[in-house]
């Protein structure tokens, strides 16, 4: 029992970690917009508040619906695109039956952020990110693919397991995400990373569970 409590506490701690640089960059971007486009600054403030509200909710819950996760991604992207207009494009391919699936918070947002931070170094155009979510037997298959510069071969086997220092960060986000996934679901759900000079794909499998099923079980047990 005590071991499980410690495990749950560690998972919630990992979920609660927010990149302070993102927060300060977002505030600086909004501050710069206040005088030249106050309406856009207002919209970005709403997105920023939504982003951090989701972070607080994620720290309390081990799972959220895929739909809420995609809203979190949208809030994050609106802030990044305000900093770097027209720098990248994101495409979604989401199976309809997956919308109500329960997943650990921030999975897709972290993978998208990782692509934006690391894949497109010094490249301002033709940057694409593809988010795919589909059913694979009893699992939810999640993948984020970019057409960036790829990961060096000497780092590929350790990313997600060991902190890798680079000019754009330490790579802790993938390490923490991998710990969360394996802590919740076991090694079957560990991150799978494939990379070449034409881009990188990070994927994982999560046991499928519907939010409708959970609500039904809760109502039955009352």
What are the functions of these language-model segments?
Residues 215-222:
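Intrinsically disordered, low-complexity acidic/proline-/asparagine-rich linker or regulatory tail/stalk regions
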